[in-house]
Design a protein with these regions (language model features):
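N-terminal segments that mediate ammonia production and transfer
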Residues: 1-168
Length: 168
């Protein structure tokens, strides 16, 4: 990410695939703009609703919480009970961390140098058509244990979607 900072100085993000959740459990990565957020409270509530959690793994404005249920149920619970939070990723192994600001600072704030993973996907961003926010930063979660990044503008997405629908 540091080497890519010149190409995209507005924000940075990374998806790590590491430390898979135990069978029957899932892993959520959550974001709060409040860095003093009470992650222990959320982890305790999730544990009470679904069973066991070893507590949150906190990295700057994000927390990873493992719960004993499927990711869809846990994600819905978070959205219903803590609408102030954003679900960055869900699945067995994925953890997505992203933030607006300089990629060099992002690497340090999130302690990324100390992480190891089976694989990772990183992105830096220079916003051209949307505002600079954590939510607009890449990678984007696209499903359980899936994410994507893209370069460029997707200004013709509605036309392409209609073409694809017509083609079946």
């Amino acid at each position: 990410l540091i080497q890519m900072a010149d190409r995209g100085p507005d924000s940075a993000g990374v998806a790590f695939y590491r430390n898979p959740a135990p069978a029957g459990s899932s892993k959520l990565t959550l974001f709060s703009p409040d860095e003093g957020y009470d992650w222990d409270l959320v982890a305790g509530e999730l544990s009470g609703a679904f069973g066991g959690s070893n507590g949150p793994e906190i990295r700057a404005s994000h927390a990873v919480i493992v719960v004993q249920t499927d990711a869809d149920d846990a994600g819905r619970w978070v959205l219903d009970n803590h609408p102030e939070l954003r679900l960055m990723s869900a699945g067995q192994a994925i953890e997505i961390y992203k933030e607006k600001g300089d990629p060099r600072e992002f690497v340090e704030r999130f302690g990324l140098r100390e992480l190891s993973a089976t694989h990772a996907l990183g992105h830096t961003r220079m916003a051209t058509e949307s505002i600079v926010t954590t939510e607009h930063s890449h990678p984007f979660s696209t499903g359980l244990d899936l994410c994507l990044v893209h370069n460029g503008s997707l200004c013709n997405h509605n036309r392409l979607r209609e073409e694809l629908r017509r083609e079946g």
